[in-house]
Structures are given as C-alpha cells and as structure tokens.
Amino acid sequence: PDQAVWNVAPGKPLFISEFGGEALYGKHGDAEVKSSWSEDYQAQLYKDNLEMFKHIPNLRGTSPWILFDFRSPFRFHPHQGGEWNRKGLVSDQGQRKKAWYIMRDYYNQKKTEQ
C-alpha cells in the first residue's frame, strides 16, 4: 500500500466504492492468505486499502462493499459461503466482523479531522 502512486482525475473529487474482501464470521487464519476466507484476511485487506487511500489527495469519500453478508444463489461457492456473498462487514446474523471495527475507527478518525 505504501508504494501505490495515485494520479486519478487531479483537481476533481474522487469517491471510492466497492472495496473489501470476503470473510466467514468467526473464522480466523493467516491474514495474508486470500483463500482462507478469514476475518483476519478481511481486516488486513481493509487496513491495506485505507493505507493506500491516504496517498490519494483528492479522495473525498469511501463506501465499502458491502455492509451485510447476503444470500446470492447465483454465486455458489462450494467450499466457502455456499449461496452467500460473505464480503460484508457484518454477518447475515448481525455479528460484526473484525473489519467492521477497522471501518468504524476509520470513520471516527475522519470525523475528528474535520
């Protein structure tokens, strides 16, 4: 993330949406292994994204993909998630994943910077 160079529409406001990754609530594992579907991986991915965003001078907002895990029968994954899209910050049962707290802290920090 520290080495990313951003030169996107200089002088114009930029909003980034649909960033993030998948995680099964309660699953823990190697934060560097995407296929682990762990909360640790998802949390690290959000941390990396937010670190990159610091280097975008014209960034004006973000919107992670997605808030809640949701049923998606056309997106069947036989090993992880089944008929569910598990990229939410909150599980389909309302449990907050580790990445939810990363984003909460990020937005709280942004509020104090204003």
Regions found by a protein language model. Give the residues of each.
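Substrate-binding clefts and catalytic carboxylate motifs of secreted carbohydrate-active enzymes
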Residues: 1-114
